[in-house]
Amino acid sequence: MAEACGVRRIKLGSQGLEVSAQGLGCMGLSAFYGTPKPETEAIALIHHAIHSGVTFLDTSDIYGPETNELLLSKALKDGVREKVELATKYGIRYAEGKVEFKGDPAYVRAACEASLMRVDVACIDLYYQHRIDTRVPIEITIGELKKLVEEGKIKYIGLSEASASTIRRAHAVHPITALQIEWSLWSRDVEEDIIPTCRELGIGIVAYSPLGRGFFASGPKLVENLDNNDVRKTLPRFQQENLDHNKILFEKVSAMSEKKGCTPAQLALAWVHHQGDDVCPIPGTTKIENLNQNIGALSVKLTPEEMSELESLAQPGFVKGERSISILTTFKNSETPPLSSWKAA
């Protein structure tokens, strides 16, 4: 296993945001991945991350919902807020038992002000649209976010799971600092169009689920140990008919990591880190031991030949099963109507 080393700093985007080269995805501490971690343990893990140099913290108002932001508010007391880069998101809500995506100006403003109150901060460093509302022209949504920047309520604007054309349209209204997207050895479809677009426009890339939602940490046995209320049990890639095939990738990565003297998770995470200094993966965990291992991935150095070998093992399309459940859209269906179609309420 590669030992944890110092966490370097990187510039995210072109507007001046500086973050730790690896972030902490906080979702699993409160939501979706089984029983939430006890609050005192969750806060201790967040503080350990910050003390270790992982200062880029990622949350959302839908995690819980809302309880993850409330957890962050407690973790950031007593001067801790000044040590971190805080990212949260809006745009997904539960309404009458259904998932809804919202990007109209009134909702954007109300969501931002609610997050500011919950996290108990004066300003959010990076505020993402979590999923694109395909009923609202993206120019309208970004226009309201631009006002929030001007009012000092948010510093930088981000998008999540947006298509290349949506990114371009948004960026024309106000500079987009970061795109959050799933990117890992088993989710490489973003490399064709999304990543080149971000790089052309100077937009940073925040890679969520860089360990394949834990797949590269445990392989197929991960599923056996999941709580019944863990959302991963419903994901297509974790269904047995797909898992029987997908485990081949884990076995090959595991064999390569053994030669490299690191864990499979560290090797998979190092691959993401080696994509460039404009990329910040945000692995999540509920265990300090795993957090230390994730930081250790920063010290795993891969040669061009090793990168090529990993990419040959995990060619786009190799993994079976969709990466998301159908109710959560991805960048592939995130186009919005033309601005000319918009009639304000």
From Swiss-Prot:
Family listed: Belongs to the aldo/keto reductase family.
Pfam families documented for this protein: Aldo_ket_red
Keywords from the named record: NADP, Oxidoreductase
Domain of life of the native organism: Eukaryota
Binding annotation for substrate: 130
A single GO molecular function term of this UniProt record: oxidoreductase activity
UniProt xrefs under Gene3D superfamilies: NADP-dependent oxidoreductase domain
EC top class, as a word: oxidoreductase
Protein known as: Probable aldo-keto reductase 5
Residues that, per the record, bind NADP(+): 209-219
PANTHER family the UniProt entry points to: AFLATOXIN B1 ALDEHYDE REDUCTASE, ALDO-KETO REDUCTASE YAKC [NADP(+)]
InterPro entries, A to Z: Aldo-Keto_reductase, NADP_OxRdtase_dom, NADP_OxRdtase_dom_sf
EC number: 1.1.1.-
Active site residues per record: 63 (proton donor)
Gene Ontology CC terms: nucleus
